From Swiss-Prot:
It is found in: Gas vesicle; Cytoplasm. An ATPase that functions in gas vesicle formation. A minor component of the gas vesicle, also found in soluble extracts. Gas vesicles (GV) are hollow, gas filled proteinaceous nanostructures. During planktonic growth they allow positioning of the organism at a favorable depth for light or nutrient acquisition. It is an enzyme of class 3 (hydrolase). It holds the Pfam family AAA_5. It comes from Ancylobacter aquaticus. This is Gas vesicle ATPase GvpN. Its EC number is 3.6.4.-. The gene is gvpN. Residues 22-36 have a biased composition (Polar residues).
Amino acid sequence: MTSEAASKDPISVLSGFGAGTATSASKNGGRTTPSALTPRPRSGFVETEQVRDLTRRGLGFLNAGYPLHFRGPAGTGKTTLALHVAAQLGRPVIIITGDNELGTADLVGSQRGYHYRKVVDQFIHNVTKLEETANQHWTDHRLTTACREGFTLVYDEFTRSRPETHNVLLGVFEERMLFLPAQAREECYIKVHPEFRAIFTSNPQEYAGVHASQDALADRLATIDVDYPDRAMELAVASARTGMAEASAARIIDLVRAFRASGDYQQTPTMRASLMIARVAALEGLDVSVDDPRFVQLCSDALESRIFSGQRAEAVAREQRRAALYALIETYCPSVAKPRARRAGGGARAGVEGALP
């Protein structure tokens, strides 16, 4: 499959989340509402056939009124894809990031602060009448604002929040009603805006810090599994993000993909590892070849830590795995020197060994 050119309406990335300009918080009928984001184009986003297919499938569920859920391992571009799909809806976007400390009040809203009122009445000069009142101020949080205004909610890594936090979502998706706590005073529920849509992302349950999703919520979500990008997409993204020549970027992409296929690691290398190597190599002007010891060291720094993931390993096992990694570097980033010059310099093996710490 050949790589595609950048899409006409890709989404920008803000602090790793992909969004555009933000509208400031406002007060609506005495309520404070959080800001929303408006997606805007970014040249670094690349749309391939794989992305178009996922986007089409996701929009099909959203247009029918179902909440969408992108599920897959880290590094597969779920968040960027979710924001790209949200941009196609043409509505402001509100983002929530899952967290173990997140509670229902953080989604819906709560009473914040106090409003004081003091009246001193001296209509009769020798009589003073004093009246004081103090009322709390209700603040809408992200879910309430999205439901009330018809925004698109992107709930990133939602399974990092505790399952009981999401009970409020059940009525939103089934009855299209958001039930507010008694402290809201003004209203006990709101009808969900017809244009409200929700997009969720999550990692597999075996990841650290991930909770199992409650069955009642999972049953309401339209789940699409997202796998690692195909080679065409990785190559297009690497070239667009780093400005590196396609031939050089292809070597790095193939190296990382081969390392991932080997299974000889404890932390899966993703497209982020490819971008890391390609970006640094482009900035430093390195040759994407085993001939350049600095490039070999760069690959070692970016990939070797994933083999052991901070765990202690025996010296023999460590050397064996490092040798396997260097063999992959030799295979996918071979020497570009002429044979005679390569023999004089010790060949590719000399370049590898010269990079060993």
